[in-house]
From Swiss-Prot:
Its EC number is 3.6.1.27. This is Undecaprenyl-diphosphatase. The chain crosses the membrane at residues 6-26, 45-65, 89-109, 115-135, 156-176, 189-209, 221-241, 251-271. Bacitracin is thought to be involved in the inhibition of peptidoglycan synthesis by sequestering undecaprenyl diphosphate, thereby reducing the pool of lipid carrier available.
């Protein structure tokens, strides 16, 4: 690749990562398609994806830094988003939401890695879309937990169980956790916020492990490309999260489910 070409590829993939990482549409599915179309595949591409995921994670930290500090008992006034004030969401909620996926992820790590292929991703996109529709249809008319601080430990644990579905590549971690939250009585907005908060420790742990294993593929020559991808993913993820939290107050997740089916069809068209 030429230098300019590699930077353009980095920017495009950073945009894709930032837009899709925290939406219930599967960033994995999008990265597979776009990476294939751009001819950017292989070990360097996998390492690049790990690095730009860190940019997306940083966006969540910036967006929810007050709430994250609050989880460890450090408060800076009231966080500027809904469902805040009672201070009932705790680190225990986050830990309960993490445990199921962490345990299964460690036990079945090698098997999960073997599932990373376009066909499995395609099926996961479809099943995840169906789950979003089921969640919208079966969710309680009046949520038991309208805000984050209304969530119970039991609800947090069940959301964590649903997060295990995201170990299937292409399912979408946010899609699984948000759907699970709605089905156990958490409002669409609060379930989305909890999904974002849960992403920080989950993704940081997984990304740190992948980055450690990929160190051999990092070179100084790739640094500009990785930096462009990281910064692009961070900025785009900030905008995507803000926009997403704004629009879900007004629309259901049905459009996201339909979009997942379209992406699944695209994966089928490109790789079958």
């Amino acid at each position: 690749m030429t230098d300019m070409h590699s930077l353009l590829v980095a920017a495009i993939l950073g945009i894709v990562e930032g837009l899709t990482e925290f939406l219930p549409v599967s960033s994995t599915g999008h990265m597979i398609i776009v990476g294939h179309l751009l001819g950017f595949e292989g070990d360097t591409a996998k390492t690049f994806e790990v690095v730009i995921q860190l940019g997306s994670i940083l966006a969540v930290v910036v967006m929810f830094w007050r709430r994250l500090f609050g989880l460890i008992g450090i408060h800076f006034g009231h966080p500027p988003h809904e469902g805040v004030g009672k201070g009932r969401l705790s680190l225990i909620h986050i830990l309960l939401g993490m445990v199921p996926a962490v345990v299964l992820g460690l036990v079945f790590h090698d098997f999960i890695k073997s599932l990373f292929n376009p066909i499995n991703v395609m099926y996961a996109l479809v099943v995840g879309g169906v789950l979003l529709i089921i969640a919208e249809v079966l969710k309680p008319k009046e949520p038991k937990a309208p805000g984050l601080d209304d969530m119970t430990y039991r609800q947090a644990f069940f959301i964590g169980c649903f997060q295990c579905l995201a170990l299937w590549p292409g399912f979408s971690r946010s899609g699984a956790t948000i759907s699970g939250g709605m089905l156990v009585g958490v409002s669409r907005y609060a379930a989305s916020e909890f999904s974002f908060l849960l992403a920080v420790p989950m993704m940081m742990g997984a990304t740190a492990l992948d980055l450690y294993k990929s160190m051999g593929f990092l070179t100084m020559a790739d640094l500009p490309m990785f930096a462009v991808g990281f910064v692009t993913a961070f900025v785009v993820a900030l905008v995507a999260i803000k926009t997403f939290l704004h629009i879900i107050k007004r629309i259901s997740f049905i459009p996201f489910a339909i979009y997942r089916f379209i992406v699944a069809a695209a994966v089928f068209a490109v790789f079958m």
